[in-house]
C-alpha cells in the first residue's frame, strides 16, 4: 500500500503523467488491475482520452488497442463494479425524486413533533430543498445524534436551537426510513466494507480531476489508501502542503486543503507516502502560459512581471451589446474557424451561470448549423406526463374547472379514438372557445348525458350566424365524451381506494387503458425517426421517473390507508426534483457548460461568456436549509471525518481557482466577454474584476461585439446561409433607417441567397424592408368566391365596409372573430331587452291590447316571469352563473319594468301603436320575413339586403298607414345626416325603405325613424322634481320625422299641435306659435328630402356591394377631424397594425357635413357617391 501525489498547476498534463504510470503498472505485473476514477460527468471523455494515451504508449499496430485491466469509473460506477451482486445493491435506489417523496412523507407524519417546520409538508419547493439537505448530511456522515449534540451545546436562548432541533428530529426519522434503500452514502459505505475484505494487493487506484471530496468519499479514499497496492491522487496544485493547509489568499486553496487532509490521514494510518511527482508541462501557447502566471501571482498577491504585448495575442477580451449578440458572435467565430480546418470539439464555451443564455442557445447554434451539447440539467416538472397527472388532481380538487380540464387536454396525451392529432387540436380549440363563451364548468356539466350544442352567443340581430353549428357541435361533444368517459372513472377509483397500493395501481392502469402510455411510445418513436435522440430520451426518462415514483410510493405507503392529498404531494415533490439525463448527439460538437463543472483540459479555444461583476466572482449562495453560520456551529462539534461542503461567503475564497481551471482548459486561446445589457433585469452590466484586471495587466483592448450593420465588413460576419440572411436584414434595415445606399457587397449577399434553398425566405425577409401596411386588392374572382356573386348582406355589414374596408374583409371575408369571453356584455343585456320587449308586446297584441291599455302594476307583474324564462335559454347562462349575476338579472328586470312603464306613458300621448316587433325583412339564416331589398349590380349579380326592425309603430288613416321605425339602443343615438351621407349610418333609411316597399292597402307611408335609449336614468333631487315628466323626457325618442306640415304629425304627440304650438317631451318635434316647425326643437325631413336620402342610400348599398366584389379592401379607416374611434374600438387592431405615424397608413379623412350641405348634394344627384379623400402624411 502507498499514497502517491501528482502535482502541478493547470499548465501541466496530469492525465499524461498518470497514463505513463498506468502503462508502467500494466507492464510490471500481468495481475495488476487499474481503477481510474474521475467525476461522473466526464467519465466517457476521460476513458476515451486514457485509452488513446495508452494506445500511443503501447505503439499498437493498426491503431487498434484493447485493455481489460483498466477500468475508468466514477465513484457510483465503482460501487456497481464491486457491489453489483450484493444484497445492498439489489435494494431499491433512493434517487433524488424518490428521496424527496420520502422526506415529504416524513414531514407529514412528524409535524406534531416539529415547531418551525410543522407546516411545510405542502411546500414542494421547501421539501425538495430539505431532501437535498438531509442527503447532504448523510453523505457528510452527520447523524441526528450529532445535531442533538450541537443543540445541547447552544445556550437556551440561541436563535438556531429550534431549527437545528427540528432538523435533528427529521434526520432521526430519515435515518430510520432510508434503511431499506440504497443511497449514495450507503453504497460508498458498503464499498468501503467490501474493499476492506478484499485482496487489493494488485489493485492500483488513480484519482484525477477531483479537487474536493465529500466526507463519505473521503472515507472511501482513505480505505483505498489503506487497502490498495497504491493510490495515486492527481491535484492541480503548485506545491505540497504536508505540515499545514494553505492560507488565503491562495489560488490553489481547495486542492491544497485536500492534499493536506489526505497526507495527514495517510501519515496517521502509517501508510507509506511516496515522493511527490510533478506532471510534465502540456503544450500551451505563449499567451496561455502568460495568463497562467498572471492568474497565480495576481490571486496570491505577488508582484507581477511587466506585460509583453506579443505574448497576449492568444488572450482576447470583448464587450457585447447583449447576451444574444455575445453568444451569436461566439457561434460565428466558431463557424469561421471550422471552415478553416478546426473541429467543433476544439471549442468549449463556459459561463459561471448559463441562465441568461439558456433560451437562445438552441436557436443560435441551429442558425449556424453548429452541433452543440449543453451540459446543463433540465427540470422534468414541465413534461406533459407530469402536467397530465397534476391536472387530474386539480380537476378533482376544483370540480372540473375550465383551466384544469384544458391543461389536461393540451398535453395531447389523452386523445379520442380514431381522431388524428390535427383534428383533435381543431376540436380542442373549438371546445376552448365554447367553454369561454358559455362558462361551462363542473362535473355535472361535463358528464351530463345530454349532448352540448354549439351556438354563437347573441349574434348580430340582423345578421346570420358565422359559425357552422353542426360541425362544431360534433367537435365539442367529441371532447366532452373523451373527458366524461375517462376522467371520472379514475377519480372514482381514488375516492374508493383503501390503500396506497390500490390508488397507485389504478393510476397506472388508467394511463394504460386510456392510451396515454401508447401515446408516449408514439412520441418516442417519432423522435427516433426524426433523429432527435434527446427528445426521445426525455419521454422515456419521464416515464421511468414516474414508474419509479409509483414503485417508491407503493413501497413506502402501499399498505397504509390511502390519503389522496399525500399521494399528490409526494408525486409533486418527486417530480419537482427530477431532471433529464442528457447525452451529446455527436462526438464532434461544441460543449457549452458552467465553470463550476470540471472539464477535461482538451479544448484548443475556450470562450468564457457572461464575465460580469455579479458572476465572476460569483455571488455567494447562502440560501440552503443550513446556512453558513449554522454549518460552522455544527462543524465545531464534529470530528474531522464528518463535515459538510462550504457554503456562503467562505466559498468566494475558492472562486479564483474555479475560474482558473475553466480558463486554463484551453491550450491555444482564451476569449473572455461580457454583455453590457442585462436583458433579464433590464439593467446595465459591469465588467468582472477579472476582466478589468486582465485588460490592465496584459495591456488588452476589449473588442466590441455588436450586431451587423452598414459599417460591418462582410468578411467579419461570414457565417451560414441562414445567419447571413439575418445579418443582411439588419444591415439593410439600418441603411433604410439612415437613408443611405446599401453597399454592393450586401446586395451581393442577397443575390447569392436567392440562388439557394433559402430563396423564398430571403425574398420574404427582404420584402419586409420595403413593406408598407397596404393590403392591396383581392382578385375579383376570389372576392366572388368569398362573398358569392349575389351578395346577401345586412345593413350593419355595409356600415362596417364604409367605416373600414379592410375590417370588413377580415370579419366577413376571412370570418375572423374575437375570442368570446364569459362576461356580461352590452350585447347580452341588449339581447335580453329585445327578447322581453318583443315577447311582452306580442302578448299584448295577441290579446288585442296595447301598452296604453294596461296598468303599471300589470307591467310590473308580467316582466319578471318573461325574464326568468328567457334567461334559461341557451346563450344566457351567464345571467344565472353566480349570485352577483342573479342580482344583476333582477336589476335588469326592474329596468325593463321602468322602460315599459315609460313606453306606456308615451303611448298614452300618441296615436301610433306597435304593429310588429322584431320584424324581419329578407332572409336571415333559415327564416324569411317581409320581402328584402334587392338591386342588380353593374357587373352582374345582385345585392340582397336583410334586416330586423325592433319595433314598427303604425297610425292608420283612411288613405295611408303612417309608420315609424323604432330601434332600441343601449347608448344614446341621433340621426346624423353626415353619417348617412357617407354610408356609416345606413340602418334607419334602409329600414324605412324596406317598409315603404311592402305592398299594402292603404299603403305604408313613412312618418319617421326613431331611436329609443334603453337606460336607467338618474335624476338630481329638487323640490319641483316631477318623476313622471322627467322620466318621459329622459326616454325621449331621437331620430327624424317625415312631414310636409304639422298636420302630417298630428298623431305623433297628441299633447301638442300646430294650432296650439309647444314642444314634445317624447319625440323631436316642436311648433312655433304661428304653427310652423320649430327646427331648433324638431328633426323633420320632407317627403322629397326623404326620397333623395333613400335614393342616395340605395346608391351607397349598390356601390359598397360592387366594390366588395371588385376586391377593394383598402386599409383607410373613416375619419372626421382627429377622431380615431374606428381603429381604437376595433377588435382587429393587432391584425391591421394601423399607425398614421409611420407615414404609410392614412385615414379616409372627410369633412363633417350639415343637413343643408347633405341635402344640397343628394338632391342635385342622389346617386353620386362621396369622394373618399385620404389624408396626406401631414394631416
From Swiss-Prot:
Q: What is its EC number?
A: 3.1.-.-
- Please provide the record's keywords in A-Z order: ATP-binding, DNA damage, DNA repair, DNA-binding, Exonuclease, Helicase, Hydrolase, Nuclease, Nucleotide-binding
What is its cofactor?
A: Mg(2+)
Does the keyword tRNA-binding belong to this entry? no
Any single GO BP term: double-strand break repair via homologous recombination
One Pfam family name is PDDEXK_1
InterPro entries recorded: ADDB_N, DNA_helicase_suRexB, P-loop_NTPase, PDDEXK-like_dom_sf, PDDEXK_AddAB-type
> What quaternary structure, including any partners, is listed in this protein's UniProt entry?
Heterodimer of AddA and RexB.
Q: Which family does it belong to?
A: Belongs to the helicase family. AddB/RexB type 2 subfamily.
| Task performed by this protein | The heterodimer acts as both an ATP-dependent DNA helicase and an ATP-dependent, dual-direction single-stranded exonuclease. Recognizes the chi site generating a DNA molecule suitable for the initiation of homologous recombination. This subunit has 5' -> 3' nuclease activity but not helicase activity.
Q: What is this protein called?
A: ATP-dependent helicase/deoxyribonuclease subunit B
Amino acid at each position: 500500500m502507498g499514497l502517491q501525489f501528482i502535482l502541478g498547476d493547470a499548465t501541466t498534463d496530469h492525465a499524461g503523467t498518470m497514463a505513463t504510470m498506468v502503462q508502467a503498472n500494466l507492464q510490471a505485473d500481468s495481475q495488476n488491475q487499474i481503477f481510474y476514477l474521475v467525476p461522473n460527468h466526464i467519465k466517457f471523455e476521460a476513458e476515451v482520452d486514457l485509452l488513446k494515451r495508452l494506445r500511443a504508449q503501447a505503439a499498437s499496430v493498426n491503431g487498434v488497442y484493447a485493455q481489460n485491466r483498466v477500468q475508468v469509473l466514477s465513484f457510483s460506477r465503482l460501487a456497481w463494479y464491486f457491489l453489483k451482486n450484493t444484497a445492498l445493491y439489489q435494494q431499491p435506489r433512493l434517487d433524488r425524486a424518490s428521496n424527496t417523496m420520502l422526506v415529504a412523507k416524513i414531514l407529514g407524519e412528524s409535524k406534531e413533533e416539529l415547531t418551525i417546520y410543522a407546516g411545510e409538508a405542502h411546500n414542494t419547493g421547501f421539501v425538495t430543498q430539505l431532501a437535498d439537505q438531509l442527503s447532504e448530511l448523510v453523505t457528510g456522515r452527520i447523524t441526528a445524534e450529532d445535531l442533538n449534540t450541537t443543540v445541547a451545546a447552544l445556550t437556551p436562548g440561541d436563535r438556531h436551537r429550534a431549527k437545528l432541533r427540528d432538523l435533528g428530529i427529521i434526520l432521526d426519522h430519515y435515518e430510520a426510513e432510508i434503511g431499506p434503500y440504497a443511497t449514495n452514502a450507503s453504497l460508498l459505505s458498503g464499498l468501503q466494507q467490501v474493499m476492506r475484505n478484499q485482496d487489493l494487493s494488485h489493485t492500483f487506484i488513480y484519482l484525477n480531476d477531483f479537487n474536493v471530496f465529500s466526507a463519505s468519499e473521503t472515507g472511501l479514499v482513505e480505505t483505498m489508501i489503506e487497502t490498495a497496492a497504491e493510490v495515486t491522487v492527481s491535484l492541480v496544485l503548485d506545491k505540497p502542503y504536508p505540515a499545514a493547509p494553505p492560507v488565503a489568499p491562495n489560488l490553489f486553496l481547495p486542492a491544497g486543503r485536500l492534499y493536506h487532509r489526505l497526507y495527514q490521514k495517510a501519515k496517521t494510518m502509517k501508510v507509506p507516502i511516496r515522493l511527490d511527482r510533478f506532471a510534465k508541462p502540456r503544450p500551451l501557447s505563449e499567451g496561455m502560459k502568460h495568463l497562467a502566471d498572471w492568474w497565480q501571482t495576481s490571486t496570491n498577491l505577488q508582484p507581477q512581471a511587466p506585460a509583453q504585448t506579443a505574448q497576449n495575442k492568444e488572450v482576447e477580451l470583448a464587450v457585447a451589446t447583449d447576451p444574444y449578440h455575445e453568444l451569436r458572435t461566439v457561434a460565428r467565430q466558431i463557424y469561421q474557424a471550422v471552415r478553416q480546418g478546426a473541429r467543433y470539439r476544439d471549442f468549449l464555451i463556459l459561463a459561471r451561470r448559463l441562465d441568461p443564455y439558456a433560451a437562445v442557445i438552441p436557436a443560435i447554434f441551429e442558425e449556424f448549423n453548429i452541433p452543440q451539447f449543453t451540459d446543463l440539467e433540465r427540470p422534468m416538472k414541465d413534461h406533459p406526463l407530469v402536467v397530465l397527472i397534476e391536472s387530474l388532481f386539480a380537476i378533482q380538487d376544483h370540480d372540473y374547472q375550465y383551466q384544469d380540464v384544458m391543461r389536461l387536454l393540451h398535453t395531447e396525451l389523452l386523445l379520442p379514438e380514431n381522431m388524428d392529432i390535427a383534428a383533435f387540436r381543431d376540436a380542442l380549440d373549438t371546445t376552448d372557445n365554447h367553454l369561454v363563451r358559455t362558462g361551462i364548468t363542473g362535473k355535472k356539466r361535463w358528464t351530463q348525458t345530454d349532448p352540448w350544442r354549439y351556438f354563437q352567443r347573441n349574434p348580430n340581430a340582423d345578421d346570420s350566424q358565422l359559425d357552422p353549428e353542426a360541425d362544431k357541435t360534433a367537435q365539442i361533444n367529441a371532447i366532452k365524451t373523451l373527458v366524461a368517459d375517462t376522467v371520472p372513472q379514475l377519480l372514482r377509483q381514488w375516492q374508493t381506494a383503501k390503500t396506497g397500493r390500490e390508488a397507485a395501481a389504478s393510476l397506472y392502469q388508467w394511463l394504460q387503458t386510456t392510451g396515454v402510455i401508447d401515446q408516449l411510445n408514439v412520441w418516442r418513436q417519432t423522435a427516433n425517426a426524426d433523429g432527435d435522440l434527446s427528445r426521445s430520451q426525455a419521454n422515456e426518462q419521464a416515464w421511468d421517473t414516474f414508474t419509479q415514483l409509483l414503485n417508491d410510493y407503493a413501497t413506502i405507503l402501499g399498505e397504509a390507508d390511502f390519503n389522496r392529498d399525500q399521494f399528490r404531494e409526494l408525486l409533486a415533490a418527486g417530480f419537482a426534483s427530477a431532471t433529464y439525463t442528457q447525452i451529446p448527439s455527436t462526438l464532434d460538437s461544441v460543449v457549452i457548460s458552467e465553470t463550476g463543472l470540471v472539464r477535461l483540459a482538451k479544448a484548443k479555444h475556450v470562450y468564457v461568456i457572461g464575465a460580469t461583476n455579479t458572476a465572476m466572482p460569483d455571488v455567494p449562495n447562502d440560501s440552503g436549509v443550513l446556512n453558513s453560520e449554522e454549518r460552522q456551529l455544527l462543524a465545531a462539534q464534529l470530528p474531522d471525518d464528518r463535515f459538510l461542503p462550504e457554503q456562503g461567503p467562505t466559498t468566494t475564497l475558492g472562486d479564483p481557482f474555479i475560474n482558473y481551471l475553466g480558463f486554463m482548459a484551453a491550450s491555444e486561446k482564451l476569449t473572455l466577454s461580457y454583455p453590457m445589457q442585462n436583458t433579464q433585469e433590464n439593467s446595465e452590466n459591469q465588467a468582472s474584476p477579472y476582466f478589468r484586471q486582465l485588460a490592465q495587466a496584459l495591456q488588452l483592448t476589449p473588442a466590441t461585439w455588436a450586431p451587423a450593420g452598414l459599417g460591418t465588413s462582410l468578411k467579419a460576419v461570414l457565417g451560414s446561409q441562414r445567419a447571413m440572411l439575418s445579418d443582411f436584414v439588419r444591415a439593410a434595415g439600418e441603411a433604410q433607417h439612415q437613408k443611405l445606399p446599401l453597399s454592393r457587397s450586401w446586395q451581393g449577399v442577397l443575390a447569392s441567397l436567392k440562388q439557394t434553398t433559402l430563396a423564398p425566405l430571403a425574398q420574404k425577409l427582404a420584402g419586409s424592408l420595403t413593406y408598407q401596411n397596404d393590403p392591396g386588392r383581392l382578385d375579383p374572382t376570389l372576392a366572388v368566391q368569398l362573398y358569392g356573386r349575389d351578395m346577401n348582406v345586412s345593413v350593419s355589414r355595409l356600415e362596417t365596409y364604409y367605416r373600414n374596408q379592410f375590417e370588413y374583409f377580415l370579419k366577413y371575408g376571412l370570418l375572423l372573430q374575437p375570442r368570446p369571453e364569459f362576461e356580461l356584455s352590452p350585447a347580452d343585456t341588449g339581447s335580453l331587452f329585445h327578447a322581453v320587449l318583443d315577447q311582452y308586446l306580442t302578448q299584448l297584441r295577441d290579446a288585442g291590447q296595447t301598452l296604453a291599455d294596461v296598468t303599471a302594476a300589470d307591467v310590473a307583474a308580467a316582466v319578471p316571469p318573461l325574464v326568468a324564462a328567457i334567461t334559461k335559454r341557451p346563450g344566457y347562462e351567464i345571467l344565472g352563473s353566480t349570485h352577483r349575476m342573479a342580482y344583476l338579472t333582477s336589476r335588469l328586470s326592474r329596468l325593463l319594468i321602468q322602460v315599459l312603464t315609460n313606453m306606456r306613458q308615451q303611448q298614452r300621448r300618441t296615436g301610433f301603436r306597435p304593429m310588429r316587433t322584431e320584424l324581419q325583412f329578407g332572409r336571415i339564416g333559415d327564416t324569411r320575413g317581409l320581402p328584402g331589398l334587392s338591386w342588380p349590380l353593374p357587373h352582374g349579380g345582385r345585392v340582397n339586403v336583410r334586416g330586423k326592425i325592433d319595433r314598427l309603430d303604425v297610425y292608420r288613416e283612411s288613405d295611408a298607414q303612417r309608420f315609424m321605425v323604432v330601434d332600441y339602443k343601449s347608448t344614446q343615438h341621433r340621426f346624423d345626416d353626415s353619417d348617412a351621407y357617407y354610408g356609416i349610418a345606413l340602418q334607419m333609411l334602409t329600414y324605412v325603405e324596406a317598409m315603404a316597399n311592402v305592398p299594402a292597402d292603404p299603403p305604408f307611408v313613412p312618418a319617421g325613424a326613431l331611436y329609443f335609449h334603453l337606460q336607467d336614468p338618474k335624476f338630481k333631487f329638487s323640490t319641483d322634481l316631477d318623476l313622471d315628466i322627467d322620466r318621459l323626457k329622459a326616454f325621449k325618442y331621437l331620430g327624424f320625422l317625415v312631414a310636409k306640415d304639422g298636420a302630417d304629425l298630428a298623431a305623433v304627440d297628441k299633447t301638442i299641435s300646430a294650432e296650439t304650438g309647444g314642444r314634445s317631451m317624447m319625440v323631436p318635434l316642436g311648433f312655433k306659435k304661428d304653427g310652423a316647425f320649430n327646427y331648433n326643437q324638431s328633426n323633420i325631413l320632407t317627403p322629397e328630402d326623404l326620397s333623395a336620402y333613400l335614393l342616395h342610400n340605395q346608391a351607397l348599398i349598390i356601390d359598397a356591394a360592387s366594390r366588395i366584389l371588385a376586391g377593394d379592401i383598402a386599409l383607410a379607416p373613416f375619419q372626421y377631424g382627429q377622431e380615431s374611434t374606428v381603429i381604437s374600438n376595433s377588435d382587429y387592431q393587432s391584425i391591421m397594425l394601423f399607425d398614421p405615424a409611420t407615414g404609410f397608413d392614412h385615414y379616409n379623412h372627410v369633412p363633417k357635413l350639415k343637413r343643408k350641405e347633405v341635402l344640397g348634394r343628394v338632391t342635385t344627384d342622389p346617386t353620386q357617391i362621396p369622394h373618399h379623400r385620404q389624408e396626406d402624411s401631414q394631416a
